Amino acid sequence: PGGSETILSKHLPSYAVVERNDILFLLDGDKNKKIKPVRISEIADADLVNTMCKYYGCELIINASGSNGKKNEQESNRLKRQVLEYAFNKVKYLPFDTPEQLLIEKAITPSEKEIIDSQTWSSNDPELYKNQIRLLAQHLYDKEEVNAEEIFCLQQMMTARLKNELPEFIKIRKIITQALDRGIIR
């Protein structure tokens, strides 16, 4: 649960430290910075946090032991390397920007398209597809304001309309299959 920053900064480090091998993090495609991972051994200790931010947009938070208010720097750097290596292996991205985009582009009915087309939208709005789904939920429930449960219900209905053989689903299955074949998840 949570957005990509919460997942990456808080959840992933915990799983990395206990070496969970049954997890793959599949994040929204718009979070992919498309930077090729470097060898962890080539990153200076002083650059570990900057590298995390460069690749993932946030620090992957680790908790090293310490005493008298000082953390154990050697342990801290070892854990940062472990977490970064884990992230390089376990973080993958959807083959589209957001799930909302996929639903709007692949799962709307003609009448829903009419509702969306009746409004003026800015293609520069980062919340474009979320706002369009909210509008559809407002029409579905005939309400000015809809809550998260109502939006989620509409998203579930739209998801049920998606065909199993969509190219996007084939790409997702390939990501998961490769992760299994390469031992990234077991």
Q: Language-model features: where?
A:
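Terminal low-complexity/disordered tails
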Residues: I116, P126-R186
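Generic hydrophobic secondary-structure signal
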Residues: L26-L27, K54, N63-E73, L103, ...
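RecA-like P-loop NTPase motor core
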Residues: P1-K34
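Hydrophobic, Leu/Ile/Phe/Ala-enriched alpha-helical segments that form helix-helix packing faces
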Residues: H11-A16, L79-V83, I176, L180-G183
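Extended interaction regions within the primary functional domain
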Residues: K10, E85, L166
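Activity-critical C-terminal alpha-helical subdomain
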Residues: D28-K143
